[in-house]
Amino acid sequence: MINEIKNDAKDRMAKSVESLKTQMSKIRTGRAHPSLLDGIQVEYYGAATPLKQLANVVAEDARTLSISIFDRSMIQAVEKAILTSDLGLNPSSNGQTLRVPLPPLTEERRRDLTKIVRAEAEGARVAVRNIRRDANADLKALLKDKEISEDDDRRAQEEIQKLTDSFIKLVDEALALKEKELMEI
C-alpha cells in the first residue's frame, strides 16, 4: 500500500517535470529547433491541424528552419499560420519549401523569456510539492485507519520527501539549462 502511494507520487512528479521540459522546448532561444513550430495549427480542409502532420520541419542551420510541406497547395496556409502565430517569425517561400529565418533575440526579449521560464519552473515546483502533499495525506489516512504504523508513516514520508527533493532538483537543472540557452548570443 505504501509502495503504491510512493510509485503513484513518483509517476506524477515525473509527468510534471516532463511537462515542464515540453513547455520549455516551445520557448524560443537563439537557435533554430523544429519543436519551435510544434504549437502551430494550420487550417486544413476546415479543420485546425498541427503543422507537423502537414509538413516536415528541419533545422537548416543554427538560425533557419526549413519546412517541406507534403501538399504543395497548403504553402500559403502554412505561411499564414506561422505569420499569425505569436512567435514573431517571417517565413519566405520558394514555391517548394518554406524557409523561416529566426531573428536574433534582443536583450529585452531574452529577459522576458527568462521570466517566463522561471514562472514555468515555479509552476512545476508547486505541482511537485502538491503531489507530495497528496501522498502525505494518503499516508495519514492509512495511519488514521490503523493500516500502517507511525514508524511506517514517518519512513514513507521521509522517502517521499527525498523523491520530492530529487524532482525539484531536476526542475532546477532544466531551468538552469534553459536560462543558459536564452542568455547565449
Swiss-Prot record:
Single GO cellular component term: cytosol
Keywords: Cytoplasm, Protein biosynthesis
Keyword check for Transcription: no
SUPFAM superfamilies: Ribosome recycling factor, RRF
Localization terms from the record: Cytoplasm
Pfam families: RRF (PF01765)
One of the GO BP terms on file: cytoplasmic translational termination
Disulfide bonds, paired cysteine numbers: none
Gene3D superfamilies linked to this entry: 3.30.1360.40, Ribosome-recycling factor
Major localisation: cytoplasm
One MF annotation (Gene Ontology) recorded for this entry: ribosomal large subunit binding
Taxonomy, superkingdom: Bacteria
Annotated function: Responsible for the release of ribosomes from messenger RNA at the termination of protein biosynthesis. May increase the efficiency of translation by recycling ribosomes from one round of translation to another.
HAMAP family: RRF
Assigned protein family: Belongs to the RRF family.
Name of the featured protein: Ribosome-recycling factor
Species the sequence originates in: Aeromonas hydrophila subsp. hydrophila (strain ATCC 7966 / DSM 30187 / BCRC 13018 / CCUG 14551 / JCM 1027 / KCTC 2358 / NCIMB 9240 / NCTC 8049)
